[in-house]
Amino acid sequence: ARATERPNETALRFDSGHTLSFAEAWRQANALAIQIQRLGVTAGATLTFQLPNVPESVPVAIAASICGLVINPVVPIYRGKELGFILNDAKSEILFIPHRIRGFDYVDMITSLRPSLPHLRHVICCGAEEDLSDDVLRYETLMTDAPSDLAAVTNVDPNDTKVILYTSGTTGNPKAVRHSHNTLAKALDNGVDAWQLGEDDMMLMPSPVTHVTGYVNGIELPFFTECKVLLMESWVV
C-alpha cells in the first residue's frame, strides 16, 4: 500500500548513504520474487539470509513473503558450525549471503558446507567481489535479468509460520523459534503504540536485521507504519 500511496517517499536509509523509497523497495522485491519462483522454490519452503544491514536485505525479506516462503534470518557472526546446523534444521532451500565481511569469506564457508546440506538448492551471493563458481549465483545478475512482470503473490494463513529465528546455542545447538504473521504483526503494533511513532519519526536501528529486533523494527516497520528507518551496518567501539 505504501508503494502506491507514497511511491517516492524514502522508506529506509543506510549509513552507506544509500536510500530505498517505498516504490523502489517494492520494485526490487517483485523482481527478486519472480526470479525465486523461476528457480523452482515454492511456497512453504525456507529461505535463509545471512546478510548485514545492507540494502539487499530488504527486497530479500519482502520477496520471500511475496512467494509465501518461511524466512530464516541468520546473524552474520555465525560460522560453519552454527550455519550448517541451522540450514539443515530449517531445511533451507535457498540462501543469500555476502561475499566478504571484515575479511571473512562467506562463499568459501558455504562451499565447504554444501556437501552436508542436502536440502540447499540455491546460493545467491550479494556484492560478489570476483568470479564465482557455477553453483553460486550473483544477486546483481538475478536482478538485472528479472522481467518487469508482476510476481504471483502467494496467499497465506496469518497463523502460518512466517519467520524462524535461532537462539545463540550457548548451551548446545541453536534452538528454533517460530513466529507467525500474526505474532510478528502484534509485536510491531505494540512497539508503535508504546513509542507513539508517526510519519515525522525515524528509528535508528543498529540491531542486525537478522535478529528479531532488527527484522521487525528495521525491515517491517516502514511498510506497516508511517515511521522511517535508518539501518546501521556497522559501528566501531
Model-predicted regions and their roles:
Residues 47, 64, 161, 167-170, ...:
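Conserved S/T- and glycine-rich ATP-binding loop of Class I adenylate-forming
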Residues 72, 78-113, 187-204, 236-237:
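Conserved ATP-dependent adenylate/AMP-binding module captured primarily in the ANL superfamily
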